[in-house]
Swiss-Prot record:
Protein name: Gamma-aminobutyraldehyde dehydrogenase
Alphabetical list of CDD domains matching this protein: ALDH_ABALDH-YdcW
MF (Gene Ontology): aminobutyraldehyde dehydrogenase (NAD+) activity; NAD binding
Originating species: Escherichia coli O17:K52:H18 (strain UMN026 / ExPEC)
UniProt entry tagged with the keyword Isomerase: no
Amino acid sequence: MQHKLLINGELVSGEGEKQPVYNPATGEVLLEIAEASAEQVDAAVRAADAAFAEWGQTTPKARAECLLKLADVIEENGQVFAELESRNCGKPLHSAFNDEIPAIVDVFRFFAGAARCLNGLAAGEYLEGHTSMIRRDPLGVVASIAPWNYPLMMAAWKLAPALAAGNCVVLKPSEITPLTALKLAELAKDIFPAGVINVLFGRGKTVGDPLTGHPKVRMVSLTGSIATGEHIISHTAPSIKLTHMELGGKAPVIVFDDADIEAVVEGVRTFGYYNAGQDCTAACRIYAQKGIYDTLVEKLGAAVATLKSGAPDDESTELGPLSSLAHLDRVSKAVEEAKATGHIKVITGGEKRKGNGYYYAPTLLAGALQDDAIVQKEVFGPVVSVTLFDNEEQVVNWANDSQYGLASSVWTKDVGRAHRVSARLQYGCTWVNTHFMLVSEMPHGGQKLSGYGKDMSLYGLEDYTVVRHVMVKH
């Protein structure tokens, strides 16, 4: 397995402390990787800064060609990437290969095209004898921090728009799941000029802090927890860096009496438990109107009970393990606290799986109340709660009564209600009669403590640029 860092176009071994990388399906150590030293972090940033002088002036066509080549080699090595992702994350292999790899390839291809469509507003003479124009220029060095739930996908979301806009990047994947990012580094080094892409390995304190705090870094992009986001914003404040934050969510799923119950059940069975629920947009906080509450709980409980946990390389496996032992304990603690309320009922699941690996049973909890922690706090596991509501006004208020603001969905056959409720929800995305669906052309990003800035779409590309005014006297 490729375990070297990419710094200034060269694959090099880390010079810091070695850290174990685990297979969460077995609990076994896959390998140990040496972290980047402080000197290597500095070297990576300075390499990116030096490369920016030329890369930032390349044509959109040239940048697009590099991104398309990278997309092609990811596609050609799709099986290798899927197997690495499956071993390091515990994802079902068929899901990694069939769902994630094509989407990752598409992200790079989309931004290759988007790079050639980015422009500033054509302007004119707003002062006699002077012509103004607006430019959208790259920022410089971007420090990108990717999470452990979708390591390669999030690396793509970070790299593609930043590079398309003309920036240079230093990427730090999670120390828990670094393998696909390090493999990507191996392939990217032969496509991009030295220093344009750099990939480091290490923990937040030892590598993340010196990277994000480096004076040559102009922007920090993070997908991660609220706590990590708060830390980075505080840590980078003295140098006034631009920050781009996607910090998790607790998606409300509003099911009205007139909804297609079978579609809701099928949707939540898929969208609430995909990737073992380790998804910031997971359909995890259901609000069911009183007329269909009992029926929905019964049918959804039966459906969730059929979800198959198992070995990632088993074609029939639908749920793999959680990412780490520490995270398994966090999920288990959240469910135990819910049980202890006395009014929340476990419909199915509610316990760790016996045996090796970090498995938690797919869980459905009914009878949750608005102020319960299971409703208010992100669990980030295969755990879905159901809360009864009376009317539209109540459920909109409850849905918005959250520190999160990333994703939401509304299930109803009433088109007017769908538009009315969607307009009032304080979330970056609202789906109607579906959930979890993402496309490269549309923006993804949140409000409130879910963060700010957009991934994907032309909006995402613009986030990696600076608006500049140029005035010419004539």
